[in-house]
Amino acid sequence: MLVSIEWLYNNLKDVKVVEIDYNPQISYYEGHIPGAVLINWRDFLSDNSRDFASPEKLSKVLGNAGINNDDLIVLYSDMNNRYAFYAYWILKAYGHSNLAILNGGIYKWLRENYPIDNDAVVVRRSEYKASKPDWSSRILVWELLSRLKEIVLIDSRSKEEYDGLTTAPPEHKCEQTQMSGHIPGAKNVPWTTLLNDDETMKSRDELGRIFSWLNREDRIVVYCRTGARASVVWYALKEVLGFRLVRLYDGSWVEYGNMVGVPVEKSISDHS
């Protein structure tokens, strides 16, 4: 599920490489992996509500990218590869199981001096058929609030966000919430602690030590600001370490930190 830079380079003709970008004009057109098609992160979202796309819309998005249902999709992204993990979580829910993530993403690809292209890839449209999503790995705020005492919460944001020093990370500093802090009982495991300096994911043994405080029977919920960073933690727990009961709260702090009447904890005093 995590493929190396070398493996991808040797298998470029046999897979569909997809770059998932938050800022496509900044990332993809400045240089991308040869043959990689671009999918804007927002294409996974619904046009009519704050939710994910319908199967019909997702089918069109993937079909326009020339992807077939049986293709092996290798994902990478900008923003420290976080949206590759988020896309993995979404696509798996919609029934595409033949998925992999480029370990280290575009950063490691460039760092090791592999070739890049600057022009958009011309693709032949395919007829993709997305399934009705299986959201068993997702939790909505209503259920979350009713189960706060039953679940193990992991906040994967930075310590500054978790403590309540800021309501948004530096890369999204204009997108503040009304409240700072964290969901009561949540333990802070910043997503970056799961990655090496070259942005590859740490080994199974290292991840096991990071999460040694968890029990296999725990019902785990991970969250961050919008779900992207939390998807890295979800992947490590579910796909690498094999925890069965892991769900992602994609509403995350953008939703929770703007809700009226919900409980909030802070690790600092609020003098406002």
Stretches with model-predicted labels:
Residues M1-S27, N103-Q178, V264-S272:
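Flexible, polar/low-complexity N-terminal or interdomain linker segments that lie immediately upstream
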Residues I39-W41:
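N-terminal, Lys/Arg-enriched amphipathic/low-complexity engagement segments
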Residues D43-I73, K187-I220:
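Helix-loop module immediately N-terminal to the HCX5R catalytic loop
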Residues A53-L148, L165-T166, G181, R229-S252:
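Thiolate-centered catalytic microenvironments shared by cysteine-dependent enzyme domains
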Residues L153, R157-I210:
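A mid-sequence, solvent-exposed acidic-amphipathic segment
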Residues C224:
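Short cysteine clusters
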Residues R244-S272:
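Extended hydrophobic/aromatic segments used for targeting, binding, or gating
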